[in-house]
UniProtKB/Swiss-Prot annotation:
This is GTPase Obg. Coiled coil: none annotated. GO terms for cellular component: cytoplasm. Residues 160-328 form the OBG-type G domain. Its EC number is 3.6.5.-. GO terms for molecular function: ATP binding; GTP binding; GTPase activity; magnesium ion binding. The keyword NADP does not apply. Its cofactor is Mg(2+). One of its GO terms (biological process) is ribosome biogenesis. It comes from Parasynechococcus marenigrum (strain WH8102). An essential GTPase which binds GTP, GDP and possibly (p)ppGpp with moderate affinity, with high nucleotide exchange rates and a fairly low GTP hydrolysis rate. Plays a role in control of the cell cycle, stress response, ribosome biogenesis and in those bacteria that undergo differentiation, in morphogenesis control.
């Protein structure tokens, strides 16, 4: 499935039905009064969060969503039927903004949560409303009003408690694969992961915690370089970050600095988010090299790294123990 996490759509509420001019036509009532009914109201457009959806792909080819119009009024003061609600399903974690102003209209995070984004127009009035002492046979009626129409920006931000970050090829996908049932694409070259991967990791209680493997950042990601800018938004909701550094890289300390700089440049409080530092691929270094590199990383970041090997399954239990402690999970 193609992963789409941004979409622009236009929503339009239904037009209100017209009122009508009509008069009573009954036997033995030669001068029946006005009986024109009101038009029905136009239907609204409603967004609803659906936990079964994982992407905004449905909005790639359809951009205009219009609710049903109200029906015109009828004789005998019958009100026309109102237009039905148009309910549009979106993934949980979808932010909705007005496209022109950027104003946040809603953040749909819980399954079944709804947000009305365009109201339908009011139905017109029938001539029965205009009966007066001066005018016993009014022919005046009003037309229904147009519904609201708005351009919207939809942004999906994944609902994960733990985000796994790091430069390309640091081993993030391998880590989420061994910790959970996720099966991301894994290969020994940069940018293997082109979309965020979600995995559920079991807590000691048996409940699940969602981890997200975020595609590799590079220098300048916060300004749009590489893939990072497109996916940094997905760690905005996380409670904890796992920063993975490749022990076999040419300059692990420099790699650490790059990611920290990008988190700070992106903003949204990411640089201050609780974070665990993980030195992955420890099998690539000699035993005497690990302490030296660990000390360098701690001096730069202020965090003591945990040395692991995701590929060989080393120290993963210790990593999870630290995760649960940071999250306050028993």
């Amino acid at each position: 499935m193609q992963f789409i996490d941004q979409a622009r759509i236009t929503v339009r509420g239904g037009r209100g039905g017209d009122g009508i001019a009509a008069f009573r036509r009954e036997k033995y009532v030669p001068a029946g009064g006005p009986s024109g009914g009101d038009g029905g109201h136009g239907g609204p457009v409603v967004l609803e969060a659906d936990s079964n959806l994982q992407t905004l792909l449905d909005f790639k080819y359809k951009r205009l969503f219009a609710a049903d119009d109200g029906r015109r009024g009828g004789p005998n003061k019958c009100t026309g039927a109102s237009g039905r609600d148009l309910v549009i399903k979106v993934p949980c974690g979808t932010e909705v903004r007005h496209l022109a102003t950027g104003i946040l209209l809603g953040d749909l995070t819980d399954p079944g949560e709804r947000l009305t984004v365009a109201f339908g127009g009011r139905g017109g009035l029938g001539n029965a409303h205009y009966l007066s002492n001066r005018n016993r046979a009014p022919e005046k009626f009003t037309e229904g009003r147009d519904g609201e129409e708005w351009p919207l920006q939809l942004e999906l931000k994944l609902l994960a408690e733990v985000g796994i970050i790091g430069l390309p090829n640091a081993g993030k996908s391998t880590l989420i694969a061994v910790l959970s049932a996720a099966r991301p694409k894994i290969a020994d070259y940069p940018f293997t992961t082109l979309v965020p991967n979600l995995g559920v990791v079991r807590r000691p209680s048996g409940d699940g915690t969602v981890f997200a493997d975020i595609p590799g950042l590079i220098a300048g990601a916060a300004q749009g370089a590489g893939l990072g800018h497109d996916f940094l938004r997905h760690i905005e909701r996380t409670r904890l970050l796992i920063h993975v550094v490749d022990a076999g890289a040419d300059d692990p300390v420099g790699d650490l600095r790059v990611v920290e700089k990008e988190l700070e440049a992106y903003g949204h409080g990411l640089v201050d988010r609780p974070r665990l530092l993980v030195l992955n691929k420890q099998e690539l270094l000699l035993d005497e090299q690990l302490p030296e590199l660990s000390n360098e990383l701690e001096q730069v970041s202020g965090r003591a790294p945990l040395c692991i090997s995701a590929a060989m399954g080393r120290n993963l239990d210790q990593l999870l123990e630290r995760v649960w402690k940071e999250l306050g999970i028993a």
